[in-house]
Amino acid sequence: VTLTAILFGGLAGVASLVLHWPVPILSGSLVTLVSIFAGGLIGALLGGVWIRRSKYGVERRLLEDYARWLVSEETVLILQGPIETLRFPVAVLRESGDIPPAVFVLHPKRENPIGDVRSPGVPLSPAQIQEHAQRLAMDHEVDPRPRRNAELLRRVENAHQWIHQVCLDLSEASRLEQGAPPTAEWILDNEFVIESNARDVRLNLPRRFYQELPALANEPYRGLPRIYGLAKALVSSAELRVDRENILAFIEAYQSVRTLTIGELWAVPQMLRIALIESIQDLAASALTELREHEIADFWANRLITANRRDPKQLFSILAELAATQPGPSPYFATQLVDHLYDEDAALVPVQSWLERIYRKSLSELNLREQNRQTKDQISIGNAFTSLRQLALLDWRRIFEQLSRVEGLLRFDPSGVYSKMDFDTRDRYRRAIEELARRSGQPEDQVARRAIELATQATREATGDDRRIHVGTYLMGEGRRELARLIPCHEAPRFRVLQWVYRHHSAVYFLGLSFFSAVFISLIVLPGLRGQTPGIRLVIALLLLIPVSQLALEVLNYLVMRLLPPRALPKMDFKVSGIPDAFRTLVVVPVFLGNAETIRAEVEKLEIRYLANKEGNLLFSLFTDYTDSDQAHREDDERLLQTATESLEALNHRYGGERFFLFHRDRTWSASEQKFIGWERKRGKIEELNRLIDGTRPEDADRLVYVGNPDHLSNVRFVITLDSDTQLPLGTARRMIETLAHPLNQPRFDAAGRILAGSYTIIQPRVSPTLPSTSGSLFSRLFADAVGIDPYTKAVSDVNQDLAGEGSYHGKGIYDVRAFSRVLSGRFPEEWLLSHDLIEGAHVR
């Protein structure tokens, strides 16, 4: 007020001098003083009004109310402002004087934005929960119209923000040393649990997926996802305690009447999180209300005690004011007020009479009921936070597959392959069923039945193609068109476009490369050659064609990776059962016998590969050659071979059995090299090994096998070939075997002996450099990235797989021995191939 008075007075004085200049000094001074006084008075009045009406003033209603509630010779100091600004003045007041004043802090009233969303149901027994689920299934009506809004997702975010604000109020009350309800401690200590679960909902329940969930057409959850209604019912009937057992029991009981979709089952954990967060929001609202009622009870108890002690005549007028301001006091307020008046009989008796008239119950009965409610709230909020933690620990993959009706149908796959596949492959099969069901309007379980029927029919037809009796052929393979016609179903435009691109991948790729090359030449080269003759333009354009085409290649590869989905291959799962005998695999590392130290280092690396890939049907070997020489035999050859033999035999002795093999061959004369070398170098090693395994040249066993039993090689199905510097990380060998062992990946041949598209003889995983090697040279630092180095096509080798379904082979991978030999045995002339990897990959796929 003073500041505004000075401001307005100064402005009035300056205005007076300006308006009356020039004037006599005496009269001008008098006018100026009068103007300053009048301006100051106006400023003071305006400042007072502004303070009263602004956030810095105390509301007149508060002044009038508290003036009525004071007793004689009593002073009150009212501070009105944000709750976080009161900590310092409250501390000062509590430390002032020998007898500090009574201090009361009243928090603002916050309304729950979505009201009370807790269902009024009572806890049910397990049998009652299942009956409740069945009744819900009969009552639920699904809205056939698609839902376009995301109201529930907004509610979750608002609930999270609102609970955070409540936590700020509760923590501020704790700093002000105010009494808080018992549930407040749970909320403050576990706010991070709410935050993490709300974040989980945002990440795992995207808007598009949410809008695909079936919605309810009847109340009380009209327009909301059906699975949300189930989650609310389960949370309510289980008293906010959700675990694996009651989730399974509730949903299985519901599905005994009405089947849930695959998407709904995947949304179960997120909907349970939403239901629990909303229940915690209600409990937080109750805690905040109880905090405010506790503060109000403190104040009115102080008023009654003060009136009783200092002016008993005002006791009943204060009580009348209390009854007027609290016409319907809550049981919590009543118990808190009575607790404060416990030793004040004169004040307690009328208050007790007033409360008993309102509730028509005795105070002891009211107090008992309130204690039971508080105990129930503590149990509920403890259950809610425990359930949120439990949801994060559950294996939802196993729960989903246990609940899914589609999963149960697919496990009747006539080939028996489906149940032996890994989870990601089974999930891709189920997503295919979702897509077909969505496009056809048929239930998902009906689509699954049709796929099983086609596979079963193929078993009766005895076509000789094992793929036809596998349900995956009709979901992911060439039989999908047949299934789509049977349903019937019109595939999505995106799916049809992708299939067309896959069938014409070469044309798409080269047309795209030509298009971008032409665009870049026209945009970059031609504008700078204006005024030149056509011949000069043509020459310069041809000279720049290679660098421009490289730029076009990078752009095209980027677009392919961004626009086409990854083409992951289906896989089996041998993690628990181990590699079957039918897929016994040999790991072979071709090396040279250079010196003893090198040999011991190679044996040690082979041992490391074994320790990282301990499997029953996985064998490990070195295939060695002597170094090139002008002589067929050198004097140190026998010593080096003996070192290798003893080292491999030591491994067999250390780990038991005959798991480690040593293959070796002598030098032969090479006319092209004019030296004695190992026949055809690495390609020759692989070819001789294949002949030994497939039985074409069994007599080679005595010549090639130096460590290990050759009889154990006859049942080898696959070979994993590695370079000396290639590691085999933990479990990698098994994952490669699982991929090549899947029926949809196993090699198939046409009548001419050529391998068919969609089947593979070689599976090559991504090859990445180790962390130390990425900084070993300038080249590595420039070209190594998050996906590593590809020796032939740099960092874009996945473009070939995503577009054409096959990649460039560079000598490290797993192959089917007999299919490999069938295609390549005797195909290449001797001493013609320097690098054999690419040409082998081109022939065998």
Regions found by a protein language model. Give the residues of each.
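Membrane-interfacial hairpin junctions
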Residues: 13-34, 527-536
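ATP-dependent phospho-/nucleotidyl transfer catalytic cores
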Residues: 117-224, 249, 274, 298-306, ...
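Active-site activation/catalytic loop segments of kinase-like enzymes and analogous catalytic loops
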Residues: 196, 223-265, 272-289
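Alpha-helical bilayer-embedded segments of polytopic membrane proteins, i.e.
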Residues: 273-283, 495-557, 765-769, 809
